[in-house]
């Protein structure tokens, strides 16, 4: 019984630590991760690059992703 309670407390502590770390913003967003709402949260070797989503010439959304610095992406038609 004590082992079950101890295990539960340890799991609770681990989950609480992970949630606290996410709230403080220590964790960075990895390559190709979305950074629309957190533009400064990409890892140090990445930049947050944003794109406008257009429908019939009208912007309907804006999406941002963490991409490699100094890399150019081109649309292949």
Swiss-Prot record:
A molecular function GO annotation: toxin activity
Which residues are part of the propeptide segment? 21-26
- Indicate whether Disulfide bond appears among the record's keywords: yes
Pfam families the record matches: Toxin_35
Q: Which InterPro entries match?
A: Spider_toxin_CSTX_knottin (IPR019553)
Alphabetized UniProt keyword annotations: Disulfide bond, Secreted, Signal, Toxin
For this chain, the Swiss-Prot or TrEMBL PTM comment says: Contains 4 disulfide bonds.
As annotated in Swiss-Prot or TrEMBL, what is the tissue specificity of this protein?
Expressed by the venom gland.
Question: Principal place where this protein is found?
Answer: secreted
* Family that this chain belongs to: Belongs to the neurotoxin 19 (CSTX) family. 10 (U11-Lctx) subfamily.
Protein name (Swiss-Prot/TrEMBL):
U11-lycotoxin-Ls1a
The root-end lineage is: Eukaryota, Metazoa, Ecdysozoa, Arthropoda, Chelicerata
